[in-house]
Amino acid sequence: AYEIRLSLVGSEMCIRDMGADVIFHAAGASGMGMFQAAEEKGFVAMGVNLNQNSIAPDYIMASMLKKLDSCAYHAITSIVEDTYTGENQMLGLSDGGVDVTVEGSNIKVSDDILAQLDELKQKVISGEIQVPSELN
């Protein structure tokens, strides 16, 4: 595990050296090495799956959330309403399946940026912005 962490930190440093301002990992708990590297090297990171902001609040700006509570609610509701098909279901912003949070971060995100983020989220929900998916 230590060797893997070292290679991941090396990758993060390489990405940072190439000019990235913010590094987003997509590996859940295995992103811990990236957060440690963010603290050691002073770059900004983003968490994923759950709110990871409190892990390193001075270095994690935001977290992308997979809202499993909402997913479970949708699944249970479909079973109760006898509409469950057993097929894969994709939940996104409009269904409450995913979201983003800055809660717990000490990095100040301006109200202007938060408003832009909300506007973009609404455009995704309305279909004005199409998010590609390998599942469809």
Identify the residue ranges that each predicted region occupies:
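Single conserved hydrophobic/aromatic residue that forms the stacking wall/gate
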Residues: A1-G10, C14-D17
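Glycine-centered small-residue hotspots that permit tight backbone geometry or close packing
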Residues: G10-S11, G31-M34
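Solvent-exposed loop/turn segments at secondary-structure junctions
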Residues: G28-M32, L50-I55
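Extracytosolic ligand-binding ectodomains
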Residues: I15-V22, Q36-A45, Q52-N136
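Redox-cofactor binding/interface segments in oxidoreductases and associated redox assembly factors
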Residues: H25
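Short Gly/charged-rich anion-binding patches and loops
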Residues: E3, G33, E119
